[in-house]
Amino acid sequence: SMKQNNWFDPFFILENLSNEEKLIQKNVKDFSDRVLRPTVVTHNRYHKFDRDLYKEFGQLGLLGSTLKNHGAAGVSSAAYGLIAYEIEKVDSSYRSSISVQSSLVIHPIDSFGSNEQKQRYLPKLISGEKIGCFGLTESEAGSDPSSMKTTYKKNQNGYILNGSKNWITNAPIADVFIIWALNEKLETNSIKGFILNKGTKGLSTSTIENKTSLKISPTGQIIMQDVAIDKSNCLENTKGWSSIFSCLNKARFGISWGVLGAASECWLIAKDYVENRIMFKKPLAANQLIQKKLADIQTEINLGLAACNLTAKAMDKNQD
């Protein structure tokens, strides 16, 4: 008899993962199905973000998972990708949230922060006790972040920040803000990163209402009006724009695994539908055109997985 086709892994990409990576994938899938899936429709409809989930993400080791210290799981890049892949099968909002926390908040503090900053912030971000966001994009500075208008001015104790950031994931619920700013002359090479804390005088957020998608994930604006911070809040080890792009590259890596998870889920829903929908006394799946579409989509998904997996291996060898 013909061997049963594994629709989801025709090129054995997932089968050739390490045992640890397979176990992580299974655990995250079980968690997603048990905890996220039952409430996802309601939470999406009512824009409800469950803050307690962050503690569960932390306990499972999903936050900052590739770090080797501060209580992080210390897993491979592919394992981090698989976390995004399985979470986004249920909802993109949860994956966005984990991506921002891991790649755009934990990563810059770990890579560019002082030892004191790492001790102060990383354990609580990794455990999910604190939530972070990443303030780069502005209403006039999206694809070209160097045209930002947010500024810092040095004073005796540190810096004064002024400006606003827009469309920021996690902003309305964040405890920790990674903010990028230029000097008052807006010189491109003056870029600096800062860590701001919720409740700092002059720092506020607003929520973007009535979004049409990613409704579980709060998105908002960050407003800074003469925010005075100590010099110990500056990420002193940033190396210009390359530091920002290292954060974005990490985030894009997680997103690329995530969208393949979403695509796999959509594919499965479509497959179940065409197998069960009877038309002219036979299932839709009996039509070759439908079969070809399913095969083509699965091929594209697996080409994506192959590329993501190769990228993961390169990242683990520091071939960024």
Predicted features by range, described:
Residues 37-45, 271, 275-285, 298-320:
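C-terminal helix-coil-helix/basic helical segment that borders enzyme active sites and/or dimer interfaces
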Residues 150-153:
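A structural signal for short hydrophobic beta-strand segments in well-ordered beta-sheet cores
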Residues 13-17, 23-24, 183, 204-303:
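Glycine-rich beta->alpha junctions and the first turn(s) of the following alpha-helix
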Residues 162-205:
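A short core secondary-structure module
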Residues 140-143, 167-170, 182-185, 211-218:
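Short Gly/Pro-enriched turn/cap motifs at secondary-structure boundaries
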Residues 128-136:
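A short, Trp-centered hydrophobic/proline-enriched beta-strand micro-motif
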Residues 1-20:
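Intrinsic disorder at enzyme termini
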Residues 59-129, 169-176, 315-318:
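Internal helix-loop-helix
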